[in-house]
Structures are given as structure tokens and as C-alpha cells.
């Protein structure tokens, strides 16, 4: 689960991390009031208007059809109002959103922490994430923080460093000092960065996050270390321990069909292909998607019905797949280990009866627990479907119906 920048900063602040202060607004008028309030509390004379969407690259991104950046400096209250008006309610297109962009429903009005006229500020990149290949939390950091970090990672990966954390002992003090030293800091700057790294890791570890990215981390001319941005991803498996954080979810930032699927316990990810697939188990789902691709099709989705699939869940899975107008065929590939094939078969029959006419050809492969009973249910239903025993046979049928 992802959250917005302003929400991530609020979490950081509770763990003692210095942040760029800001107030969220969802209208130009609220934005102006937020700017006035920030001027009172922080003394800032300039402000930064920051689009709040679940995507990076906002600083370089533009509002569709305009030259308005997703993050812009406002030097007056009139600027705050104008920029907010240009951004709110419109589609922001960045490298991470694709051509359609994402609608901006909120802006963060933040204090300007770069101090006009100062030349001794420095931006860094710091993130904490789970390196699944190593089975360890890892701190990634670089002296090349800012809007061009993606370019740095691609062109000069040697400028990004990693510090692995031993899960037995956690982050050690010497590791924090090592990171600060490698970032070229000394004196008060080194002390402040050491403290910053320790607090950031504590926040990450305490909330069961899978990633906490700060880009940029700013060192001011008076050696303050400030989180200017934040990007947080939670481990969904740990959210039951943090109901307050689960409430931060913004479903307007997610695909509506994926949200609906989640409500029925379905693991669904929409793709751009023409063959819908319904599978139980993530590994089998990925293999099925490969088979579809090798057969000349393109998977329209990833859909895992899980190990407790029943007729109602299978019917809902069909409804979700068929909402995609690009789907020209559906491949059902179920291995009955925990899930019973007869339940899946009954779900397919019920879906046909309850949904009326289905004009998309369906290829069904059911193997494992109660597969014989499942075949009987399908055969006696009179449904016009293609049945397969081997996976290659299913792939050949996909190729046939697409041609």
C-alpha cells in the first residue's frame, strides 16, 4: 500500500525526523489559507506547491496539455492560488504515470527550505527498503539526490551505495556514521545526518514498511538535515498491526477494478493484453501469463483467486475480467491442491447463468482435487467452452481462438 507525501512526512515527524513543513489543500482557496498559516508558523516568504499523487517524477512532470509543472515555487500568495488552480483537478503526466497521467485531487503547500540566495545547500538521496534477494533491510544512499536520481541510477549506478542491515542486531551506530561520512559530511553535518539515518530506519522498522524513500534529503547552510519529500510503501501483510495506517489508503489513486477485486479477496492486476486469465497461486499465474505470451496473445490481467476459492469468488473473478473490453478470450488454469476443482467449475457455471450471454471464448484447464467431478459439472452444464488437460493443449487452444 502506498500513501501520499504529506502522510509519509507526518509519520516521519512522529519519529523525530526533521521535515519540510506543509499543509495539504484540495482547493485554491484552501491553498492560500495554508500558505498564510505556514508564513505564521515557519516564517517562510516563499512556498512550494506540490501535487499529491502516488507517482514519482512530479517535479519534472507536467499537467496534461500545459507547461505547468507538478511541483512549482510560489513567490506570492497570488502565485500559490494560480499554481494550485492550474494543478488541482487535472491530469499530471510523469515518467511513472504513463501517457494518461494521474488526476491531482490534493496539493501540499510546503515551506521553502532552500533559503533564497543561499549557495551552500546540498541534496542527497536516502532510502530504506527490503532487499528480497538478500533477505535483509538495506539503506541505499547517494550524494546525487534530487529530480535526476533515476538518471543517476541508470547512467552512473556506482554513485549509489548500499548498507545492509543484519536482522539479528538491527542498524548499528557505526553504520549511521559510515553513511554520513560516505556522503561527504563532517562536523555538525555528520552528526545531524547520523541522527537522521537512525530516526529514518526506526520509522521504517516500526511501521512494517517495505520502502521508505526520501529524495531529496537536504542539508542547509546551517547543517540542518531535512526530509523534503517522502515516499512510503507499506507491507500489506503487516497492516493488521497498524489499523491507523491502513486508514491512510487512498483508493482514488488505484485502479477501480483492482480495488473491487480486493474486496472479494482476489489478487488482481490489470494489464494491457487481450487474454484474461484466472489462476490459483501466484507462481502458476505467472507461468500461465508466459504461456499466453508464447501462444501469440498478451495477458490482460494477473488474477489469483487464492487457495480458498469458492463459486461466488470465481463468479466475481469472471465479472472483473469481462469488464475489460480488450479481452478476447479467457484462460482458466486451476491446480486443485487446497482449492477444489468442482467448486471452481460450479463458479464457472454460475457465472454463465447469472451473467447471461458471454461472447468471449473460454478455455478451461482443471487438474487436481476433484478434477473428475469438475469435468462432469462442466460437461453436463452445456456450456460452450474449450476443455484442456495439458498446459500446452490450453496454450494451443488460446492460439486457435485468437486466430
Task: Outline where the language-model segments fall.
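ATP-dependent carboxylate/acyl-activation modules
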Residues: 1-214, 218-332, 342-346, 353, ...
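Conserved catalytic network of the ASCE P-loop NTPase/AAA+ motor domain
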Residues: 355-357
Amino acid at each position: 500500500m502506498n500513501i501520499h507525501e504529506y502522510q509519509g512526512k507526518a509519520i516521519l515527524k512522529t519519529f523525530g525526523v526533521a521535515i519540510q513543513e506543509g499543509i495539504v489543500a484540495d482547493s485554491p482557496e484552501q491553498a492560500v489559507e495554508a500558505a498564510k498559516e505556514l508564513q505564521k508558523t515557519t516564517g517562510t516568504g516563499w512556498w512550494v506547491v506540490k501535487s499529491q499523487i502516488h507517482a514519482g517524477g512530479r517535479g519534472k512532470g507536467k499537467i496534461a496539455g500545459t507547461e505547468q509543472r507538478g511541483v512549482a515555487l510560489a513567490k506570492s500568495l497570488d502565485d500559490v492560488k494560480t499554481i494550485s488552480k492550474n494543478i488541482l483537478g487535472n491530469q499530471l503526466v510523469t515518467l511513472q504515470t504513463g501517457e494518461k497521467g494521474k488526476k491531482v485531487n490534493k496539493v501540499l503547500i510546503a515551506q521553502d527550505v532552500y533559503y533564497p540566495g543561499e549557495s551552500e545547500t546540498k541534496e542527497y538521496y536516502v532510502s530504506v527498503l527490503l532487499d528480497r534477494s538478500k533477505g535483509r533491510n538495506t539503506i541505499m544512499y547517494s550524494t546525487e539526490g534530487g529530480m535526476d536520481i533515476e538518471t543517476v541510477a541508470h547512467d552512473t549506478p556506482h554513485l549509489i551505495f548500499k548498507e545492509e542491515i543484519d536482522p539479528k542486531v538491527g542498524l548499528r551506530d557505526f553504520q549511521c556514521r559510515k553513511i554520513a561520512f560516505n556522503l561527504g559530511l563532517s562536523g555538525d553535518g555528520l552528526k545531524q545526518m547520523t541522527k537522521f539515518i537512525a530516526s529514518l530506519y526506526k520509522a521504517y522498522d516500526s511501521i512494517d514498511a517495505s520502502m521508505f524513500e526520501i529524495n531529496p534529503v537536504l542539508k542547509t547552510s546551517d547543517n540542518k538535515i531535512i526530509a523534503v519529500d517522502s515516499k512510503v510503501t507499506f507491507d500489506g501483510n503487516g497492516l493488521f498491526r497498524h489499523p491507523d495506517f491502513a486508514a491512510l489508503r487512498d483508493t482514488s489513486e488505484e485502479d477501480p477494478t483492482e480495488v473491487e477485486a480486493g474486496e472479494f479477496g482476489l489478487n488482481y492486476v490489470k494489464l494491457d493484453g487481450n487474454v484474461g486469465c484466472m489462476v490459483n497461486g501466484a507462481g502458476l499465474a505467472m507461468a500461465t501469463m508466459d504461456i499466453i505470451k508464447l501462444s501469440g496473445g498478451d495477458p490482460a490481467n494477473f488474477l489469483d483467486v487464492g487457495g480458498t476459492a469458492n463459486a461466488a469468488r470465481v463468479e466475481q473473478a469472471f465479472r472483473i475480467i469481462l469488464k475489460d473490453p480488450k479481452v478476447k478470450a479467457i484462460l482458466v488454469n486451476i491446480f486443485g491442491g487446497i482449492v477444489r476443482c468442482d467448486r471452481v467449475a460450479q463458479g464457472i457455471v454460475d457465472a454463465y447463468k447469472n451473467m447471461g450471454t458471454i461472447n468471449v471464448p473460454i478455455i478451461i484447464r482443471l487438474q487436481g482435487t476433484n478434477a473428475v467431478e469438475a469435468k462432469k459439472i462442466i460437461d453436463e452444464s452445456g456450456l460452450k467452452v474449450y476443455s484442456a488437460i495439458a498446459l500446452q493443449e490450453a496454450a494451443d487452444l488460446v492460439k486457435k481462438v485468437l486466430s
